[in-house]
């Protein structure tokens, strides 16, 4: 396969690679990217890949992701690769990992759950299954699949 640079290099920031084709928009959504951001975001959708057939690639200039953002990406793209770019070079590269518990990153779909009341309780979910993705609230035991999580 011929190597072609489809999106220009970034000086500093984050590259999210190996996102399943079509899920890049969802990744951008959970990262809170919107029209008023003060950094450049590039999204390539349906890029040919030897490993995956097709994939999405996201480049975010001048922004580095925190643990909660990486956890959210792992829910959408469990095999995504994160590259930290500094001065046009890869300074760090790693694959996201789906944690055994997600604390404070999602909202429980059960409106009666204690995490959705005025109580100062942070949401907490355990991973029941990775394929297909199923998580369970540790407080009310409501289970949610991928469609429940991102709608």
Curated annotation (Swiss-Prot):
Keywords: Metal-binding, Pyrimidine biosynthesis, Zinc
GO molecular function: metal ion binding
GO cellular component: aspartate carbamoyltransferase complex
Cofactor(s) of this protein: Zn(2+)
PANTHER family in UniProt: ASPARTATE CARBAMOYLTRANSFERASE REGULATORY CHAIN
Subunit record text: Contains catalytic and regulatory chains.
Job of this protein: Involved in allosteric regulation of aspartate carbamoyltransferase.
Name the UniProt record assigns to this protein: Aspartate carbamoyltransferase regulatory chain
């Amino acid at each position: 396969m011929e190597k072609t640079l489809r999106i220009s290099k970034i000086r500093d920031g984050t590259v999210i690679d190996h996102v399943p084709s079509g899920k890049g928009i969802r990744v951008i959504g959970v990262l809170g990217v919107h029209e008023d951001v003060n950094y450049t975001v590039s999204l390539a959708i349906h890029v040919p890949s030897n490993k995956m057939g097709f994939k999405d690639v996201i480049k975010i200039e001048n922004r580095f992701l925190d643990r909660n953002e990486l956890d959210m990406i792992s829910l959408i793209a469990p095999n995504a690769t994160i590259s930290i770019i500094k001065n046009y070079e890869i300074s760090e590269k790693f694959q996201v990992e789906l944690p055994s518990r997600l604390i404070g990153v999602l909202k429980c779909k059960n409106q009666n759950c204690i995490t959705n009341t005025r109580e100062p309780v942070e949401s907490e979910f355990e991973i029941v299954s990775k394929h297909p993705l199923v998580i369970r609230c540790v407080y009310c035991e409501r289970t949610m699949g991928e469609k429940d999580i991102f709608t």
